[in-house]
Amino acid sequence: MILIKNGRVMDPKSQRDQVADVLIDGKQIVKIASAIECQEAQVIDASGLIVAPGLVDIHVHFREPGQTHKEDIHTGALAAAAGGVTTVVMMANTNPVISDVETLQEVLASAAKEKIHIYTNASVTQAFNGKDVTDFKALLEAGAVSFSDDGIPLESSKVLKEAFDLANANQTFISLHEEDPQLNGVLGFNEGIAEEHFHFCGATGVAEYSMIARDVMIAYDRQAHVHIQHLSKAESVQVVAFAQQLGAKVTAEVSPQHFSTTEDLLLTAGTSAKMNPPLRTQRDRLAVIEGLKSGVITVIATDHAPHHKDEKAVDDMTKAPSGMTGLETSLSLGLTHLVEPGHLTLMSLLEKMTLNPALLYGFDAGYLAENGPADLVIFADKQERLITENFASKASNSPFIGNKLKGVVKYTIADGEVVYPN
């Protein structure tokens, strides 16, 4: 048993926000009250700390199978726990791609060994070929939670329409990475800084928002649920809002890097700041924050994308892989760039990092209640920390190394067990 004493208990589902004690027995919260005594429990003094549901991150890359020099499911789980994250959804762009039941079962068997809750998407198309839709029914029955070809866009509208119909028939949804390659230049560099500093055509805004426009309208026609991943452009927020007003079933996520910083970071952080979609302009950054405030964007998800340091340390930045490690900085970036400046309340930030992503997938997570799951994070919301290369992840490709950020995770509890510090 674990007894958490005197913490500020914040639950986005009930909107509870009060200093209270929380008693955990086994994998459940058994009591939340102003004062609880329990002689046999391990006591955690949470005085002055926030006690919240464990974070739910629905967009991570754990690189297993096939790319375990970058990350694996075990180190990914450790990184999640260090960041206060107790539930994750992995993407299918592994090697081999999670397109068939056999690969899916191998991945889930590895995930089951970890102490946090690890789910995975399967791919929309066979080995990401963009043509042949996978067997949604068989993959769902084998444990996939939804479908995405994340990492690359789905170019064929005909295939997308077929996939939406299949998703509807199987009561699931599709998540999409929106960057039209026919309208894009070099990926990972926003068009402005690409032209001005690097003298080539970069990743354009129109490649993102035109593809979102196409896909939300096909979803509208098919009455299918589409989830837009890591949108980064001001116009993208407006397109999603328009589709939602029409009555389309559209949800959207933003990654912490896109509300925290801009394209200029490429000049100082180098390849660590190279990602798809790229860091954009200040106008775009403020627009995605407005999207979070208005409710157009309901989910914050990291797109945790670890890479080996040698892969990022190339002389030609265009040859470096895109992506950054994000699980261990996401809460701090939200506290520093959304709560501290007054864009979101702490409760609203927590809602977008816990309850909303859990509701999207139907997970029993993202809330604190008696008889509910004992998945919690305990953190100091105002305490500052210096971001260093010492991550639990195998990777250290973060453009935020050297930054002072608010928010220090003190304990992460998953299934009633302290998983951080471990």
UniProtKB/Swiss-Prot annotation:
One of its GO terms (molecular function) is zinc ion binding. Substrate binds at H61, F62, R63, N93, N276, H307. It is an enzyme of class 3 (hydrolase). Belongs to the metallo-dependent hydrolases superfamily. DHOase family. Class I DHOase subfamily. Keywords: Hydrolase, Metal-binding, Pyrimidine biosynthesis, Zinc. PROSITE patterns: DIHYDROOROTASE_1, DIHYDROOROTASE_2. This is Dihydroorotase. Pathway: Pyrimidine metabolism; UMP biosynthesis via de novo pathway; (S)-dihydroorotate from bicarbonate: step 3/3. It comes from Streptococcus pyogenes serotype M3 (strain ATCC BAA-595 / MGAS315). Zn(2+) 2 binds at D150, H177, H230.
